């Protein structure tokens, strides 16, 4: 229900094509013949990522199949770090080799994880990209081994870049402090105003948008801050809207990141990398490489 329009995977399924995602974002209950969903616990840190995946993989018991018939590491620890990508790479190669899906989505995690932790430029980030490069090289080798280049288009791309930050702004902690929302059992229990942070931006919703006094209260609290630019939701271009219609949008200034944490202090020193902000920011640009069937060398 998070998807508002058909994806390319829906269109492929409608044509009777075989689809795979090993893994792919927003894929639970999606149009896939083979699926390792990209999913992890949100609220309960003790909940098992592996168990969540087992509930939604396709065909059912696919994780068990790989754990039993191959050297797949199926421990909870294997859902993080380099081992996660190695496991998913093994699954991707096996599915591709045995089934040759018409359309496959395959996501490598480490570059994003490393940049969130260390920022854009760090030895660990370079290490993560070299690791990802080796996995892409193995995909190219597999397509070559199976003589599939006459039938295969390979696209290597990202969905965003990263922006360095030195400070987290915990907006909902601020709204809680000012009496605009209540917190209990680690979550938000009620609210007059609430923020949906996405790193480089935050979408502010009012429970009663027609309450001019409450609206002005929020404006006074959030405008003219060194850490963010407040924009009326109605003034935002359609291409920059998220989380449905929002009453206000905050765009993070350089060096700041909007976090979902509820703990004080609401201004929290924290270095790393983030995204989710204005896509016109050059640092959020990513790359795209394509090769194979239908791709002309050097063409843009």
Regions found by a protein language model. Give the residues of each.
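C-terminal accessory region downstream of the catalytic core in glycan-modifying enzymes
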Residues: 24-26, 220-221, 283-300
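Short glycine/proline-enriched loop/turn "hinge" motifs that connect secondary-structure elements
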Residues: 96-98, 196, 277-283
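His/Asp/Glu-rich, glycine-adjacent segments
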Residues: 1-119, 214, 223, 259
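Flexible glycine/proline-enriched surface loops and loop-helix/loop-strand junctions
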Residues: 73-77, 120-122, 186-187, 197-203, ...
């Amino acid at each position: 229900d998070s998807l508002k329009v058909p994806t390319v995977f829906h269109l492929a399924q409608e044509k009777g094509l075989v689809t795979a995602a090993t893994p792919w974002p927003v894929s639970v209950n999606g149009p896939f013949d083979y699926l390792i969903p990209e999913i992890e616990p949100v609220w309960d840190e003790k909940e098992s990522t592996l168990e969540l995946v087992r509930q939604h993989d396709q065909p059912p018991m696919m994780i068990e199949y790989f754990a039993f018939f191959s050297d797949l590491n199926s421990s909870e620890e294997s859902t993080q770090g380099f081992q996660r990508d190695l496991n998913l790479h093994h699954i991707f190669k096996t599915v591709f080799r045995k089934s040759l899906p018409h359309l496959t989505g395959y996501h490598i995690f480490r570059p994003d994880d490393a940049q969130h932790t260390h920022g854009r430029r760090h030895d660990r980030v370079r290490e993560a990209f070299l690791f990802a490069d080796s996995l892409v090289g193995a995909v190219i080798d597999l397509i070559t081994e199976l003589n599939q280049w006459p039938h295969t288009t390979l696209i290597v791309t990202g969905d965003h870049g990263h922006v360095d930050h030195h400070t987290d702004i915990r907006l909902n902690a601020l709204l809680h402090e000012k009496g605009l929302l209540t917190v209990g059992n680690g979550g938000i229990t009620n609210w007059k105003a609430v923020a949906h942070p996405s790193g480089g931006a935050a979408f502010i919703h009012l429970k009663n948008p027609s309450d001019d006094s409450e609206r002005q209260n929020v404006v006074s609290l959030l405008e003219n801050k060194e850490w963010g630019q407040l924009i009326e939701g109605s003034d935002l271009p359609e291409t920059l809207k998220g989380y449905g219609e929002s009453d206000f949008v905050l765009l993070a200034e350089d060096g700041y990141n909007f976090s979902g944490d509820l703990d004080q202090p609401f201004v929290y020193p924290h270095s790393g990398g983030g995204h989710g902000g204005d896509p016109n920011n050059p640092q959020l640009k990513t790359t795209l490489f394509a090769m194979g069937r239908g791709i002309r060398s050097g063409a843009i």
